[in-house]
Design a protein with these regions (language model features):
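Hydrophobic transmembrane alpha-helical segments in integral membrane proteins
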Residues: 1-15
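N-terminal signal-anchor/start-transfer transmembrane helix
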Residues: 11-28
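Hydrophobic helical membrane-anchoring modules
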Residues: 34, 48-80, 84-90, 94-134, ...
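Short beta-strand/loop segment that forms part of the nucleotide-sugar
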Residues: 138, 162-172
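Donor nucleotide-sugar binding loop of glycosyltransferases
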Residues: 143-146, 172, 225
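Short, well-formed alpha-helical segments that are part of the catalytic scaffolds
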Residues: 143-157
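A conserved acidic beta->alpha catalytic loop
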Residues: 169-177, 222
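Acceptor/aglycone-binding surface of glycosyltransferases and processive sugar-polymer synthases
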Residues: 190-209, 214-216, 226-313, 340-350, ...
Length: 376
């Protein structure tokens, strides 16, 4: 066999192996989606080297000049980098879980003096009131231009009669924390660079430990109108014809009765892609699988609160797919939402492209993990 053919076969085999291994480790939650995307891209490059004559010819020239040692060292380097990425992924996952527990412990022990003062004043005023069953969770990161308006609407008698409000402040470097401190009825937990998904999971753990029955999660940027809260809450408590209440209520931007919401071409394609994937696998038509405005019953958020059951980066369509495949009851309601007017979105710049790559790997990985691995 010619040297060129051997090189093409080797590169193609290596590319396929890298892609399959990365998908496998992502499916069994041994590798983060970020690392998996990087290795999948490398696998595609190796496949291209094996398939494109010009690239494989260039590789053959390296061998012809007696540089096999360099190639072997490169292969060994890739192998050890792969092992390192697996180890680092594991450490990152454990670190997020540990950081969440530490943040919860610090709050429970009253390490933050301002938080301790707020807790004392609030509980003195509410000690005679019946325990509330709803917790509203708001992850906050650098939202000083928006969070005050959102809390002003949330801290009204109609909402506070039935709900407690929890803000998870994720290392905000602006005045977000000071603004939240101005609302004594709002509980706050400070975390440090854990990301959106981990902030939500901390909220779920808080809800479990404080025995809430329902959770509504919403963004702190003003896009999710507070008028949606009562409707989602009622839907969570409403039983269907079988007498069962939904585990998850998705507030949709794209159902009949929803307010008109501007969406870019990239996001429209992403929504279509994820809707199609969910429909093909589960048979369910979900109008808005990436909505951040959701209501959850105790069965759902108790599951999310457990280690490795929730995406700590961008929990979106992959979590919807997961819960449908696990037979959780899910429904949608039309919602009123607004375009962001101030501040910077976490999906700005090239982030939507990176987000799509992660989701395009995470969603199939969820399907493989539940439909294939769990049956063994």
């Amino acid at each position: 066999m010619e040297a060129g053919s051997i090189i093409r076969i080797a590169m193609t085999t290596a590319g396929i192996a890298v892609m399959l291994c990365s998908f496998w480790f992502l499916s069994v939650k041994k590798m983060t989606a970020d690392f998996a995307v990087i290795w999948e891209i490398l696998g595609v490059l190796l496949l291209m080297i094996g398939a494109v004559p010009g690239l494989s010819g260039w590789t053959q020239n390296l061998f012809a000049r007696g540089e096999q040692l360099v190639i072997c060292i490169g292969a060994a380097g890739v192998f050890f980098c792969y092992l390192f990425s697996l180890l680092l992924s594991r450490l990152l996952m454990k670190n997020h879980e540990l950081a969440i527990e530490v943040s919860m412990l610090l709050r429970e022990k009253g390490a933050d003096h301002q938080e301790q003062k707020r807790r004392e004043s609030v509980w003195q005023e509410t000690v005679e009131q019946p325990r509330k069953e709803l917790l509203i969770i708001l992850p906050v990161r650098n939202e000083e231009k928006n969070i005050g308006k959102v809390l002003e609407q949330l801290c009204c008698p109609e909402i506070l009669e039935t709900a407690d409000i929890l803000c998870i402040n994720d290392a905000s470097s602006d005045g977000s924390e000071e603004i939240i401190d101005g609302y004594p009825c709002v509980q706050i937990v400070n975390v440090y660079g854990l990301g959106y998904g981990s902030a939500l999971q901390l909220g779920y753990k808080y809800a479990v430990r404080n025995k809430y029955q329902y959770v509504i999660q919403m963004d702190a940027d003003g896009q999710h109108d507070v008028c949606n809260i009562p409707m989602i809450y009622r839907k969570l408590k409403a039983s269907d014809t079988d007498g069962e209440c939904p585990d998850i209520v998705l507030a949709s931007r794209f159902m009949e009765g929803s307010s008109r919401f501007p969406v870019s071409a990239v996001k429209r394609f992403a929504f279509w892609l994820f809707r199609t994937m969910i429909h093909m696998v589960t048979g369910r038509k979900i109008a808005d699988p990436t909505t951040g405005l959701q209501g959850l019953g105790s069965r759902a958020f108790s599951y999310y609160a457990q280690y490795n059951n929730f995406d700590h980066q961008y929990p979106d369509a992959d979590m919807v797919m997961q819960m449908l495949l696990l037979n959780y009851r899910l429904t949608e309601v039309p919602a009123v939402m607004h375009a962001r007017t101030e501040g910077k979105s976490m999906h700005s710049g090239l982030e939507p492209v990176s987000y799509m790559l992660r989701m395009c790997l995470s969603v199939p990985a969820v399907v493989f993990r539940i439909k294939v691995l769990r049956r063994r």
